[in-house]
Amino acid sequence: MMPCFVMLFGICCLAGCEGSKHHLKKVRLNEVAHSIFYAPQYVAIEKGYFEKEGIELELTTGFGADKTATAIISGDADIAFMGPEATIYQFNQGNADYLINFAQLTQRAGNFVVSRNKEDFQWENLKGKKVIGGRPGGMPEMVFEYVLKKHGMNPQKDIDLVQNIDFANTSGAFVSGKADYT
């Protein structure tokens, strides 16, 4: 009878500990952008799946791979969602302590072309128009220029490419009328 009591008491004690905030491992995640591509993560946060796995997830948005990489290097984040460009730049500069990319999160780039006007979009519509691009050398900008070239356009000649707006301010700049597309 005593072994059953001890076992029952132990189970009750363990059950009382489940879900306790005191035992959660804090993980600081810095995402490059708040994106529809990370929707499964946002659902998991809202549904409490991380807590059920013993993780207290602290989510911040870096608004650019350069800032997200800086958060990792400075110790302000434990893990990051971003493209590989920051790692490549660090490695090419000869940094001994460069970042390591270890997983592919999405199958494709998260680029969208947004127009000021409702139209049946064709890539040729961009010719001669002002377009807010990304940071030179950043993954979104490199992908955008690649796609333009695949559609027979020269990004430096065929469009008026704006690349001097900080990532966090691009949507505000577009809404305020700074470009025809973003």
What feature does the model see in each segment?
Residues 22-176, 180-181:
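Short, glycine-/small- and polar/acidic-enriched structural segments
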Residues 19:
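Short, conserved catalytic or interaction motifs in soluble domains
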